[in-house]
Regions:
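Cofactor-binding loops of NAD(P)H-dependent oxidoreductases
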Residues: 1
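A short acidic, Gly/Pro-enriched loop at the edge of an enzyme's catalytic core
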Residues: 4-17
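A short SAM/SAH-binding and catalytic strip from SAM-dependent methyltransferases
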Residues: 15-31
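A short glycine-rich, Lys/Arg-flanked "PGG" loop and its adjoining helix->strand segment in the class I
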Residues: 31-46
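Conserved class I S-adenosyl-L-methionine
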Residues: 46-83
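Acceptor-substrate binding/catalytic loop of class I
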Residues: 54-62, 89-104
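Short alpha-helix
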Residues: 95-119
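Core SAM-dependent methyltransferase catalytic element
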Residues: 112-114, 139-161
Length: 161
């Protein structure tokens, strides 16, 4: 469904809005995304967000070379076999994603009168979602060739004025 349309069908305000891994890469417009978040937050409400760092989306699937821009210059279009839920499904399809730099994420939220309370970056992911991940500590995974040199995930908390 179209998250941008949610304010047209849901008429509630919340103390917390939470968005997690793998969400904004499917969205072309973070300004509209931030409008939706602000729309549903009560004054003083908190937006909690955790996402893969845009740095990791710059690489090819095997993390051997940079393939895409860090900046949202154009949609990323790839051909994928299978589906998100079933990689062995007999299906070939194009999918479109966008790589949003962290500055775009933060600035879109600030433009909607949300105040940034915290921002953190992590050199690991809490689960093995990329090819060739290795668990270096219980519940912490890294892309071996990147190690702890680059961020894998980031999180933030923002509060609505």
């Amino acid at each position: 469904s179209d998250v941008y349309e949610l304010p047209k069908i849901l008429d509630q305000k919340f103390d917390i809005v939470y968005t997690s891994y793998g969400t904004i890469g499917w969205l072309p417009d973070l300004e509209k995304w931030a409008e939706v978040i602000s729309h549903f937050l009560k004054p003083g409400g908190k937006f909690i967000f955790v996402e893969f760092h845009p740095f990791v989306w710059m690489y090819d699937d095997d993390f051997t070379h940079l393939k895409y821009s860090y900046f949202n210059e154009m949609p990323i279009v790839e051909i994928e076999e299978g589906t998100y839920a079933n990689q062995s499904a007999d299906l070939v399809q194009n999918y479109v994603m966008w790589n949003h730099p962290t500055s775009d994420v933060i600035n879109s939220l600030l433009s909607q009168n949300l105040v940034l309370k915290s921002f953190d970056e992590y050199s690991w992911s809490p689960y093995a979602c990329f090819r060739h991940n290795s668990e270096f500590e219980k519940g912490k995974y890294r892309i071996p060739q990147l190690g702890s040199k680059v961020p894998h995930v980031f999180s933030l908390v923002a509060e609505k004025l």
